[in-house]
Amino acid sequence: MLFALCLMTGVLSSCGKDTSSTETTKKDDNTLVILNYGKYIDESVLDQFEKETGIKVKLEEYESPEEMYTKFSAGSINYDLVCTSDYMVERLINEDQVLEINFDDFEYYKNLDSSIIEASQIFDPENKYSMPYFYGTLGILYNTTMVSDEEVSTWNVLWDEAYKDSIIMQNSVRDSFTPALRLSGYDINTTDENQLNDALDLLIRQKPLVYAYYVDETGDEMAMGNAAMALVYSGEAAYAMELNDDLSYSVPEEGSNLWIDSWFMPKSCHNTEYAEKFLDFLCREDIGMLNFDYVYYATPNLAVKENLDEETLSDTTIFPTDVRCINNMTSTRQSYRIISGKN
């Protein structure tokens, strides 16, 4: 029997706190309820939006796209805006859970890079349902005093028994499957049941070597020297490298993927005018800069990039140029089904 990967047990350990309320949120006509990754927006941005518009913002947080889908599907909270990964945006579009965004009245949407908007057509073909927020790659953050550059040139190092109890993996099904699929020579978006099970077998074999499955804690753990390497998003790697000069980042030769986190308006949105006003606000140069400085991931906001120094712009950990990632930005449709029951 086939189940969604988010129901899989035995491969990933759950971790972290639940930052959302378990009670149904009472809708205030003057309040936007937003669901976003943890630590993924500068809260001063929310304060400034409230001050300028008089519209209140209630922020709910989650750790993984699978957790987001569970929260969203429960229906106990009527969200007005959600930020999540590209493949989950596509899933919800296909499930007819998403409203069209009217960009015609946006004043600052023009600040967004047209190439990133075009890349978003992989999961939002007409760019009608989503707005890009940040983008980046998935790779290996490693401590150069423990691991050589040559070793991290391949995903195979994540299965090296010499690093038992010193490997951090992502507590996200999609991301954990990426290295296993690439190492096996498979497309990261495969829907082939046998290929997915091959990757699952690799992850099960890897589990005894893993120090922990994290999301938000990875950068800090690596900065403190608690592990030799970690599967991370590029922005998290850049953050950790600022804290520890011994850290470096690599996209293995087998390739990875370029991801685009995006905002969408669910059908539970009670005031599309306010929601669209908030999205346009995020596109402003000053607001985009606040968010970039806080999150430190690649921003699609060209007005922000014009004000960054050359050292930052040329840092490929932040702004990826590796074609091995860009060429893997392909459709994720229905790539989350496997045989369950293995552990």
Predicted features and spans:
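A ligand-binding cleft/hinge motif common to bilobed small-molecule-binding domains
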Residues: 88-91, 223, 229-246
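A bilobed periplasmic-binding-protein/Venus flytrap-type ligand-binding module shared by bacterial periplasmic
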Residues: 139-146, 182-183, 259-271, 281-282, ...
